[in-house]
Amino acid sequence: MHLDVCGGCNAKIGACDLSAIIRNLPKYKREDILAGFEGNEDGAIIQVTDDIAIVTSLDFFPPMVEDAYAFGKIAAANALSDIYAMGAEPVSAMNIVAFPEEEDMAILDEILKGGADVCKEAMTTLTGGHSIHDPKIKYGLSVIGKLNLKDIKRNNTPKVGDALYLTKPLGVSLLMSGYTVDEVSEEDYQAAVDSMCRLNKHPYDVLKDYDVHALTDVTGFGLLGHLCEMADGASAVIYADKLNVLKGAKEAAENFLFTAGGQRNRNAYGDKITFEIDDFAMEEVLYDPQTSGGLLISVDPEDGKKMFDEMKEKGIDVAYIGEMIEPSEKSIYVR
């Protein structure tokens, strides 16, 4: 299977280009749509009863790994993540497939098996899908979840004083980029693949019992891009030495193995960020697009300590990374 340098969430269209297009689209607002384009939410929320809503989202992309089964797992975990990020539990999913007519169908079989295994782990029923012939392989899911209205999690409602936590390490796209030119070890590459395959169901099952004020998943816009979206009405401080970074990712950045997505993120969000550190490689890690990245959690600081301990006990690679502060000149300060 062809390893696409611009695969995974690195293939995402840049935030500036996308925002300009979306702003000009004709819009019709139904009263039962509680979340959509507004606020850059991770999914749409549709109210069904006085208490219950459904959440819909979809994600798909070209491969960023050579193993077809692993690609299926990563794409499915990434698509399901948006549902968890809204505070919902996924219920059903449908496959989205683009596959070359001349390609070996055994590859598609492995991709779909990977996706199906992740859906099974998420206790989500695959109910069908849609496939087309296409010169390049692409795969993902359209997912429906459900939640109680009181459990909705927005991505832009943090409170000043909140603690910030991230549930996966950073640097996957830098490692994928380095691996394509034999500059990243097999061990470091596999650690990135394993991280992308992990479901965000596990941290979600913990955080839903705590006083979480804002929640999103870190994907194509990198940690800094998604935190800029979260820091609405506040600013954030990130402590670089607290971040979990995959082994080899900073070395890839130091060797100038940048990703196109990372540079798009720097262009889109750079004027909202102040770096108080002198570490260009860490800057690249923070802008790096993440595929199937972790959940970014803004939580009451006392609850956050208990949540952190419970996640650690359950083997989740969570890190305390910073805090929300009073609104300031910039959205984010990296210290």
Model-derived regions, located:
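Small-aliphatic-rich amphipathic alpha-helix that forms the alpha element of a beta-alpha
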Residues: 68-94, 110-121, 199-211, 218, ...
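Active-site glycine-rich loop that binds ribose-phosphate moieties when present
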Residues: 142-151, 187-208
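Glycine-/charge-enriched secondary-structure boundary and capping motifs
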Residues: 4-6, 17, 103-125, 134-137, ...
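N-terminal glycine-rich phosphate/pyrophosphate-binding loops that anchor nucleotide-derived ligands
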Residues: 1-85, 124, 159-164, 316
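A generic local secondary-structure boundary/capping motif
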Residues: 33-35, 43-46, 82-84, 116, ...
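Short, compositionally biased
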Residues: 176-192, 314-317
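Glycine-rich anion-binding loops of enzyme active sites
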Residues: 49-65, 89-184, 323
